């Protein structure tokens, strides 16, 4: 899907702008779709919506936060549900040493991993899934993820405004 198509869709259906922000925030955070979906799509969409004044910056960032947080929680729950059976596969058992190392790291730094992982696009969708496989409780993950997504939304706001200002000058 090209950005031009999204732009055309929004020009003819502006009432769906907020849904697209939520959808792309969600999709880039999910373990499967987020692995191949570039963050630039959501970023470009947010800049576009801000520039044409379809949504205010607080709305854009709040909706993106909700979408990304929802995607993270879903990824965590997927990890909780299929993680134990995934760890029993031959593929994973052959890499048990690396898995144990990763598990120890995540057990020790789990909530901090959520925060740092949120700012690294390549690992963003994997962190919630991997933490779901560990013994981290949902409540602890949830709190860490709300903090991480809030910090990310603030960074998104700063980037949107800085890029949008450069387009107007």
Task: Give the location of each predicted region.
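Hydrophobic side chains within alpha-helical segments
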Residues: 31-32, 43, 75, 121, ...
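Transmembrane alpha-helix interface/packing and boundary motifs in multi-pass membrane proteins
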Residues: 22-42, 116-117
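Central hydrophobic cores of alpha-helical transmembrane segments
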Residues: 39, 145-146
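Transmembrane alpha-helical core residues of multi-pass small-molecule transporters
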Residues: 24, 67, 147-148, 152
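Membrane-interfacial helix-loop-helix
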Residues: 1-21, 52-129, 133-142, 158-167
């Amino acid at each position: 899907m090209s950005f031009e198509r999204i732009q055309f869709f929004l020009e003819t259906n502006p009432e769906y702008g907020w849904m697209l922000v939520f959808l792309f925030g969600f999709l880039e955070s999910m373990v499967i779709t987020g692995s191949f979906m570039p963050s630039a799509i959501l970023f470009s969409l947010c800049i576009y919506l801000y520039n044409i004044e379809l949504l205010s910056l607080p709305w854009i960032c709040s909706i993106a936060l909700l979408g990304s947080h929802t995607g993270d929680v879903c990824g965590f729950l997927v990890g909780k549900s299929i993680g134990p059976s995934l760890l029993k596969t031959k593929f994973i058992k052959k890499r048990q040493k690396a898995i144990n190392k990763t598990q120890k790291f995540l057990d020790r730094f789990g909530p901090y991993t959520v925060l740092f992982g949120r700012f690294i696009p390549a690992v963003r969708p994997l962190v919630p899934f991997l933490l779901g496989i560990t013994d981290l409780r949902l409540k602890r993950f949830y709190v860490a993820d709300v903090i991480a997504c809030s910090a990310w939304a603030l960074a998104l706001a700063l980037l949107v405004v800085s890029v949008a200002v450069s387009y107007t000058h």
